[in-house]
Curated annotation (Swiss-Prot):
Pathway: Amino-acid biosynthesis; L-arginine biosynthesis [regulation]. The lineage of its organism: Bacteria, Pseudomonadati, Pseudomonadota, Gammaproteobacteria, Pasteurellales. It comes from Haemophilus influenzae (strain PittGG). This is Arginine repressor. GO terms for biological process: L-arginine biosynthetic process; protein complex oligomerization; regulation of arginine biosynthetic process. Transmembrane segments: none annotated. It holds the Pfam family Arg_repressor_C. It is found in: Cytoplasm. NCBIfam families: argR_whole, PRK05066.1. One of its GO terms (cellular component) is cytoplasm. Belongs to the ArgR family. Its main location: cytoplasm. One of its GO terms (molecular function) is arginine binding. Regulates arginine biosynthesis genes.
């Protein structure tokens, strides 16, 4: 992938007006790039962590959030977790987009011995259910301590 293609691709996504991969293909072809197809665009979207979101006109479009990057196992947890809150029944963890499943897998691996009965993860939100034998405040503190560590 050339630097020019990467730059043009990112510039197009920053315009927040492309709702389909075929629209991105067409726009890049109009700029003179050859060999561009939907499959290549799909790989580029994944590589750069693009997400579909609503723009200011409430249209679903692809974009590259500047402040976000695709999380991986070497990312410090404190950089991926945005907020941890709870009520009497659940702990809710808000993460950067794409990080919830990675963090939920880590929490599940800690397991019942540390007071975690299970997790449910979406793209950027995790529900943590505590076991009956661990006070939720204690589990919350353990989870917050875990997020302060860098793995």
């Amino acid at each position: 992938m050339t630097d020019n293609l990467t730059r043009a691709f990112k510039e197009l996504l920053n315009q927040e007006r492309f709702g389909s991969q075929s629209e991105i293909v067409d726009a890049l072809k109009k700029q003179g790039f050859t060999g561009i197809n939907q499959s290549k665009i799909s790989r580029m979207l994944s590589k750069f962590g693009a997400v579909r979101t609503r723009n200011t006109k409430m249209e679903m479009v692809y974009c590259l959030p500047n402040e976000l990057s695709v999380p991986n196992t070497s990312s410090p947890l404190k950089n991926l977790v945005l907020d941890v809150d709870h009520n009497a029944m659940l702990i809710v963890i808000k993460t950067t987009p794409g990080a919830a499943q990675l963090i939920a897998r880590l929490l599940d691996s800690i397991g019942k011995s540390e007071g975690i009965l299970g997790t449910i993860a979406g793209d950027d939100t995790i529900f943590v259910t505590p076991t009956n034998d661990k006070p939720i405040d204690e589990l919350l503190q353990n989870i917050q301590r875990l997020f302060e560590n860098t793995l």
